[in-house]
Amino acid sequence: MEMEKRTPVLDGQGINTVLIRLAREIIQRHTNLEPLVIIGVHTRGVHLARRLADTIAEINGRAIPTGDIDITLYRDDWTKIGYSPVVQSTQIGFPIDDKTVILVDDVLFTGRTTRAALDALTDFGRPAKVELAVLVDREGMRELPIQADYVGMFVKTDKAEMVNVLLSETDGEDAVVVNTP
């Protein structure tokens, strides 16, 4: 039986460095942070969104409202992942109408998760603008015309490979690894 090959791409320090860079890019692009809110896509996008908001606050001194969104029932493949999908809660404790929403996810792959998140987001209001921030962009794998505004790093992979983001909040460690069958 063959073992999967696990190739480390980023460690915890690397993830922190990337989040600092992304926070600075957001601050530079948005001189007025007042209309800005950050919403993470369950599960790891939620933790990254909180970390990103905390990093912006550390750099700029301005707290950014954060929320999280569950896209399970908005996915176009949920029947393929099981007839009893596990639905998590959505917590958006502020209006998003006329706000600039930065949607945060761990990995941008086909674009389908982002599409589902955009669909879910419209149930909560009509933002002035939505921008996408991802820790990892698996470039060249898109099935939909979706592109991130803020990218931590680009990782070139084969379709059969898996990019896994591990975060201390859910996995006990911070790392990005590529698993090759």
From Swiss-Prot:
Its EC number is 2.4.2.9. A motif (PRPP-binding) lies at residues 101-113. InterPro entries: PRibTrfase_dom, PRTase-like, PyrR, PyrR_bifunctional. It catalyses: UMP + diphosphate = 5-phospho-alpha-D-ribose 1-diphosphate + uracil. One of its GO terms (molecular function) is uracil phosphoribosyltransferase activity. It comes from the Bacteria. It is an enzyme of class 2 (transferase). GO terms for biological process: regulation of DNA-templated transcription. Keywords: Glycosyltransferase, Transcription, Transcription regulation, Transferase. Gene3D superfamilies: 3.40.50.2020. Belongs to the purine/pyrimidine phosphoribosyltransferase family. PyrR subfamily. NCBIfam families: PRK05205.1-1 (NF003545), PRK05205.1-5 (NF003549). Regulates the transcription of the pyrimidine nucleotide (pyr) operon in response to exogenous pyrimidines. Also displays a weak uracil phosphoribosyltransferase activity which is not physiologically significant. This is Bifunctional protein PyrR. It comes from Desulfosudis oleivorans (strain DSM 6200 / JCM 39069 / Hxd3) (Desulfococcus oleovorans).
